[in-house]
């Protein structure tokens, strides 16, 4: 386990140096967005900047993205600094932890950061040297979510129930390849009622589902009610059970407890035994 991003880069320096391509794109694993990196690289090269950083402008930074960094920009979208989001302003440019630069500069920054402090991150060394470098920001458009804690995971799932939001993330021309799981279509019984929900294949639904997400192969028995919840694959909700504002983990069975309801502002988590 690496203590920061630079430690990971340093550990894999031999592979990085062996790559023959002149540019690097560094992107995070915990942020969800769609971006054409060919276009972003072209923008970076045409701008003449040393480093290009991707950001997303939001108007709710007081309540959300509190574990993210922000970019302070000048009128020409030059980056003045990278700072933590302290939640003291609603309008912020959330840094998407996405960088483009020449590979040689990337390697140089890693070595300079290591010489200063083992605790330095890539953002730290860019902050340290931003007066010596031409660092520019490029604005991202479309769906964006940062999964930094349980609450943001829940919120991102709820946001993607909205078909308009989902369409800005998922593009038929850019298919997402995942594990194949061949199963039959979901079976909706006569007693089933579904409203504003996303239901995967292979489910059996006899109860009510409202504003929720169901993974593959879930079983929802008669008179069960699921509201504002994320139910992961293989879960079973028993007859007459009410589940609201929850994340239900894979293969969980809720059969005997008849009501599992949390505050909408503090959704609950039901783990598998």
What positions do the PLM features span?
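Left-handed beta-helix
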Residues: 114-273
């Amino acid at each position: 386990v690496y203590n920061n991003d630079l430690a990971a880069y340093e550990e894999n320096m031999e592979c990085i140096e062996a790559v023959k391509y002149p540019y690097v794109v560094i992107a995070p694993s915990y942020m969800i967005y769609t971006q054409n990196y060919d276009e972003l690289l072209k923008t970076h090269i045409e701008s003449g900047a040393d480093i290009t950083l991707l950001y997303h402008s939001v108007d709710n930074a007081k309540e959300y993205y509190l574990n993210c960094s922000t970019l302070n920009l000048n009128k020409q979208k030059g980056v003045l600094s990278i700072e933590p989001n302290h939640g003291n302003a609603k309008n912020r440019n959330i840094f998407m932890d996405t960088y483009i630069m020449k590979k040689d500069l990337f390697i140089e920054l890693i070595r300079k950061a290591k010489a200063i402090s083992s605790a330095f991150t890539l953002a730290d060394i860019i902050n340290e040297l931003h007066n010596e470098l031409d660092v520019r920001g490029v604005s991202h458009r479309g769906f964006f979510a940062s999964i930094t804690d349980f609450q943001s995971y829940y919120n991102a799932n709820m946001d993607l129930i909205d078909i308009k939001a989902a369409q800005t993330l998922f593009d038929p021309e850019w298919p997402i390849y995942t594990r194949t799981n061949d199963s039959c279509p979901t079976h909706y019984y006569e007693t089933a009622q579904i409203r504003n929900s996303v239901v995967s294949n292979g489910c059996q639904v006899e109860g009510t589902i409202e504003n929720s997400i169901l993974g593959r192969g879930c079983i929802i028995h008669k008179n069960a009610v699921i509201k504002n919840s994320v139910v992961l694959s293989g879960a079973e909700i028993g007859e007459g059970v009410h589940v609201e504002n929850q994340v239900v983990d894979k293969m969980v069975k809720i059969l005997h407890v008849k009501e599992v309801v949390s505050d909408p502002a503090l959704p609950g988590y039901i783990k598998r035994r």
